[in-house]
Every structure is written in C-alpha cells, then in structure tokens.
C-alpha cells in the first residue's frame, strides 16, 4: 500500500538525500521508554518536535503515528501536558467509538457463514464495503449492492474493495499485476516458503491464489495492514489489523502471537518480509517498527544463527535511499521499477512521470536477483547486478549510477554522476537544476550545516541539546516571571479596589452621621 501526499514533488522534496527546507518535523524517542505514549484510535502516538534551521527546538508534542492530516486524526497533546480524569475518560470513549464495528472473531464467523451461502445469496455492499449475510439485507436495501459474489472474487478482495483515497493518511496504490507477478516469481525462485506482507494486500492475495491453484507452490503468507476491511476476507492466521508506524496490533496479544508464530516457524528459516509503506510516512518510525519485527524473528534463532539477517524487500521511492540506508546499512537499491494499478504517475514506461520512481531496497545480494530482460533489464558484469537499459556503467565512478532509469552524466567538478537535466552551478559549487535559486534552502544538517549527515546523527547534537535546554529553561523562567507579575498586578488591583470600597463606606457613614 503506497500513499502519496500533495503530489509527487512534495514527497520527493522530503525524501531527497540531505535536502532540507527552512523547517522540518522529526520523531524523537521519549526520555523514559517505560512511560507509555498516549493512545489515539490508531494506537500509541509518536513524539514529535519541530526543528528550524538557525532556531532552537520548540515544545515537543504527541500526535497520531498514521495520519499526517489533523482532519483524519486530531490527536494533539504536549509532552508535559497534564490531563484531567474527565478528559482522559472522554479520550478513551472516543478511541473505542473509532474502532471497527465488528471484532476479529465476528468477522471470521461471518466469513465462514458467507462462503456456505449459495451464489445467488452472496452479496457485497459497495456503499458500506461489507459482505452481507441474509439478515443484513434489509439494512442495506437503499445501498449499492453487488450480487453473485464468487469464490474467485472473494480471493481477490483488493478488487472488491474501493481503494482508500486520502493521500495524507492511507491512500492505497495497489501493485500492478506485472509487478505483483514478478515479485511472486522472484520470491519462489529465491526459495522462500513464507512471506510476511506488511502493507502489501495485493501481493498477499496473489500468493494465496497461486498456492490454491498450484500444488507445487508451498509459499504461505501473512498480511499485516491498517485497513481493517480485509479482516472480513481472511482467517486469523492470514491477516492482522496492524499499524506499521507504531508496531501496534489492534487485536492485542492474540494477533501479536499470530505474527510471532509465523516469523519463528521452522526456526525462522525460509521467510522474507515484503513491505510497501505509505510514501508520505516518515522513515524513522518505519525503521523502528521493522527492527522490532526483526527482533521478534531473532527470538526464534539459535545462538549460532545470531549473525543472520531477516531478508527484507522494502518498496519505496529511490529518493529515500540515503534515509533507508542510514537505518539499514546492508540494504541496496535494485533498478526494478515497481508499478501501481491506480496511480497515474507511478507507472512503468513513458505514461507516468519519468517512469515509476518506486524501487526495491533489500539486504539480499543483488547478484542473486534476476530482473526480467524482456522488460529491458540487463546484467552489468563489473557491478555484478541487473540494471535498467539506460543505466550505463561509469568507469570513473566504477558503478552504474542512475537512480531514475535515465542515463546520468558524469560531472568532473562534482566528481560524481548527476541527472541529465542538471548543470554545474559555480555559485553553489555543485550541480543543480538550471532554474534553481542559489539562495534557496540550504542542504545538510540543521545543527552544523554539513552535507553528509542529518541533525539526528550530528556529532554536535549533545552540545545543541544542552543549549536548547538552557534556552527552554530561560524561556520558562521568563514565562513564570510574567505570570507572577500578572498575578501580583491582579492582587494589587484587588487590594486597591478593596481600599477604595472601604473609604467610600466610611465616607457614607460620616455623611450619614
């Protein structure tokens, strides 16, 4: 499931290596991990801080992990804010109201009853996106209802369900059949027997469909996805309602144990995780979640296998490469362009933006992964990997350097290959688009300005945090002083008013006497 924000450019700007605007939002780890984060309808919230270049950090706050738009989840709480019992009770009630109308057990029971119905009685409400039992028909008589739902249709729920379209929260861009079939064939060729599908519903259903139609295929799949609608199509051992931004299982320990058992089956052998997160999501919380899944997998490993890594395919735009490799240094990016059915830009060929920017990041050696030559991929002997047709090997860089599928040009001044549309700017002293602003947003670290790292990994971050803490304390003292002066002024005003009142009373008594 891939999500876009307000257009391709916004996502590319956020993911570009080292490219930082005048401000940004970062996820921070709480000082005391033992203190649980407050809950919103999507599980534990994340702690954020706004960072502005040249200015200090502002007050930290908790917000929803899954929703980038306050209209979708308006949770907001300052880190140091104390809530009353009434507000906490109201929040808990709101969180309960926002949960799916049916429990996981109820969904399974309804599904088992549904598949036993004759074809003429199998109905699906397209308005409510729900499988209907005969007792439900009356409540949906005014809705748009699809009849004669076949078993084949039940096995392809991603084609029955309308894709969620909120771009900032959970927009669903589903793998095109070409890319999905390539992934299934590749997983089979690499010898994997189990696939943990994190946010990849179409891959999950194609794996199950292939297994049901091909006796030679023994690949099993478990889907973890935030879209609870899939719970009505799968048994408990095939689907878990899950938020990948905070590692939250909506159905609690039962679902967690399903995932754990799947990861640790056969002592963790023969499994791979394939994930397709929303592109608008922050890389850091995703990396933290994936490391928790890796740790769960490692629990089933013997001491001799402690050096092994869980094989992973992380499907994401190529301009997030530096961010992903920051958290997973063993990952490499493949040239394969992943397509999506319902996205006008993320498509293979020349119908999309500059062909699909979506790639596969993996810790599997690239020389083991064969890309389809009929789609224009070729093997580069010096690089020992498959590359796209126009990705030419650069002798100076000793690499096939293109990231976007076009032929890149080597810049002798920058000492690296750059996009064909870029030119070298003598003012900026690096290559950039021809119409760029030389006085535009600076690149690099917010703290020291260096280009080779982010603020979170800056060697000067401790000094910066001490300075920020001192500034916050100074601001707090100033705020407290202003409050005291205001209170003092109000007290003095009250005293003066009391004195005036007493003087008037004495004057009235004097005049009356």
From Swiss-Prot:
Binding site for Zn(2+) 1: 40, 42, 64, 73
Zinc finger (GRF-type): 40-82
Annotated consequence of substituting residue 343 to A: Decreased S-adenosyl-L-methionine-binding
Pfam families xref list: N6-adenineMlase, Zn_ribbon_GRF
GO biological process, one term: rRNA methylation
Location(s), subcellular: Nucleus, Nucleolus; Cytoplasm
Record keywords, A-Z: Cytoplasm, Metal-binding, Methyltransferase, Nucleus, S-adenosyl-L-methionine, Transferase, Zinc, Zinc-finger
A cellular component term, taken from the record's GO annotations: nucleolus
Start-end of Polar residues biased regions: 487-496
Name of this protein: rRNA N(6)-adenosine-methyltransferase ZCCHC4
Source organism per UniProt: Homo sapiens (Human)
């Amino acid at each position: 499931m891939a999500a876009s924000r307000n257009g391709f450019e916004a996502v590319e700007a956020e993911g570009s290596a080292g490219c930082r605007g005048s401000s940004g939002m970062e996820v921070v780890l709480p000082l005391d991990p033992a203190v649980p984060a407050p809950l919103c309808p999507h599980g534990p919230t994340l702690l954020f801080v706004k960072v502005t270049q040249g200015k200090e950090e502002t007050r930290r706050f908790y917000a929803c992990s899954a929703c980038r738009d306050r209209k979708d989840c308006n949770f907001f709480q300052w880190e140091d804010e104390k809530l009353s019992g009434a507000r906490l009770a109201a929040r808990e009630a709101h969180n309960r109201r926002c949960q799916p109308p049916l429990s996981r057990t109820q969904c399974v029971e309804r599904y088992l009853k549904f598949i036993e119905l004759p074809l003429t009685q199998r109905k699906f409400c397209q308005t409510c996106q729900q499988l209907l039992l005969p007792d439900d028909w009356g409540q949906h008589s005014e809705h748009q209802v699809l009849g004669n739902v076949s078993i084949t249709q039940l096995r392809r729920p991603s084609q029955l369900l309308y894709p969620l379209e909120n771009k900032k929260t959970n927009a669903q861009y589903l793998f095109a059949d070409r890319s999905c079939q390539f992934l299934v064939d590749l997983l089979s060729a690499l010898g994997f027997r189990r696939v943990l599908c994190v946010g990849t519903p179409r891959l999950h259903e194609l794996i199950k469909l292939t297994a049901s139609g091909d006796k030679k295929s023994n690949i099993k799949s478990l889907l973890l996805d935030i879209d609870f609608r899939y719970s009505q199509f799968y048994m408990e051992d095939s689907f878990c309602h899950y938020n990948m931004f905070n590692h939250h299982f909506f159905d609690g320990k039962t679902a967690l144990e399903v995932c754990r058992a799947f990861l640790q089956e056969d002592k963790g052998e023969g499994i791979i995780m394939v994930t397709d997160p929303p592109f608008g999501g922050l890389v850091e919380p995703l990396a933290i979640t994936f490391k928790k899944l890796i740790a769960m997998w490692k629990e089933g490993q013997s001491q001799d296998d402690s050096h092994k890594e869980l094989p992973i395919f992380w499907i994401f735009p190529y301009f997030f490469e530096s961010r992903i490799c920051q958290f997973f240094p063993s990952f490499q990016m493949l040239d394969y362009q992943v397509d999506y059915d319902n996205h006008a830009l993320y498509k293979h060929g020349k119908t999309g933006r500059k062909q699909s920017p979506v790639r596969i990041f993996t810790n599997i050696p690239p020389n083991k992964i064969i890309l389809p030559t009929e789609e224009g991929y070729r093997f580069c002997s010096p690089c020992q990997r498959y590359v796209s047709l126009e990705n030419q090997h650069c002798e100076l860089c000793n690499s096939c350097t293109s990231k976007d599928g076009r032929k890149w040009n080597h810049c002798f001044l920058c000492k690296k290959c750059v996009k064909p549309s870029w030119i070298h700017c003598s003012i900026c002293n690096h290559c950039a688009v021809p119409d760029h602003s030389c006085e535009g947003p600076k690149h690099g670290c917010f703290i020291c300005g260096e280009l080779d790292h982010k603020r979170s990994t800056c060697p000067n971050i401790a000094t910066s945090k001490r300075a920020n803490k001192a500034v916050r304390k100074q601001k707090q003292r100033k705020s407290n002083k202003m409050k005291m002066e205001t209170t003092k002024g109000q007290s003095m005003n009250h005293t003066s008013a009391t004195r005036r009142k007493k003087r008037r009373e004495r004057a009235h008594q004097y005049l009356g006497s």
